[in-house]
Amino acid sequence: MATIYYEKDADLKILKGKKIAIIGYGSQGMAQSQSLKDSGLDVVVGLRKGGASWEQAKKDGMKVATIEEAAQQADYIQMLIPDELQGKVYHEQIEPYMKKGKILGFSHGFNIHYGMIKPGKDIDVVMIAPKSPGHLVRRMYQQGAGVPALVAIQQDASKKALQYALAYAAGIGCTRAGVLATTFKEETETDLFGEQVDLCGGCTEMVKASFETLVNAGYQPEIAYFETLHELKLIVDLMYEGGMAAMWDSVSDTAQYGGMTRGRRIINEQSRMEMWRTLEEIQDGRFAREWVLENMAGRPHFNALTQQDAEHPIEIVGKELRSMMPWLKQKK
């Protein structure tokens, strides 16, 4: 069973008197920096000067500096820019200021685990990874609650790295919910696997394939959309709220029997072999190297696949059907 840390295990005071630099002001950067500030900590946001995020952070009342200035000032530097940018930004704008005793933090272990960033041995390297999007991190903090998070320690030069990381987690509200201990290796490999096999890759390919099957069999695209994509949210919400057993309890017996008997034919031995193959590519670094090279080449494959999915018939019919759903317009 995982070790879980709570409020009683964290001492926010250990970060008082230290300056925290949040590098990036996207979903997580915005949520984490604002919550740390509201927790009474000294926070500066490191950004590219003149960019849209710079003005937004200033408008939100944050102290803003260039990445170099923030890194030079800070005792604790949290990297919250995209994975593919972190290595270059770290080496060019942060590494020169990583002096002994500083803390380097992440919310995803990709660059540390695969060696794109190799910090000196005299600094702490930690991870606090909230298990929710940034807007929910912020909303739960403001409501006096928090979202679960992961904590990992890669280097403990100070012998206080876990204390610093848990204090950071407390500063963004995560110790109110619980912080699970992991490693950079485990977080990185399981996160990538989930994205590729289930959450992003497997799910979208399953939806497209089932939609295509119905349309090619002569069913109306609109009906196929409802049955293969639209209703997916209903099922996922049930699993999210109560687990798979609760989901089965909520659907009809016909749906449960059909799903249990036929679902095992869809996810068959060949599918499981591909899951293992995908995991091996993550574990041995092949996927990481492929992604780095793809970015170096200007993302030709990434852009082609993105365009291909954008032009899929399910996108065309989906846009039309979503225009009939006023509750979606209200969210915008």
Curated annotation (Swiss-Prot):
Similarity-based family: Belongs to the ketol-acid reductoisomerase family.
Write out the residues that bind Mg(2+) 1.
191, 195
Name of protein: Ketol-acid reductoisomerase (NADP(+))
- The domain of life is Archaea
The record's active-site residues are: 108
The biological pathway it contributes to is: Amino-acid biosynthesis; L-isoleucine biosynthesis; L-isoleucine from 2-oxobutanoate: step 2/4; Amino-acid biosynthesis; L-valine biosynthesis; L-valine from pyruvate: step 2/4
- Please provide the record's keywords in A-Z order: Amino-acid biosynthesis, Branched-chain amino acid biosynthesis, Magnesium, Metal-binding, NADP, Oxidoreductase
Q: What is its EC number?
A: 1.1.1.86
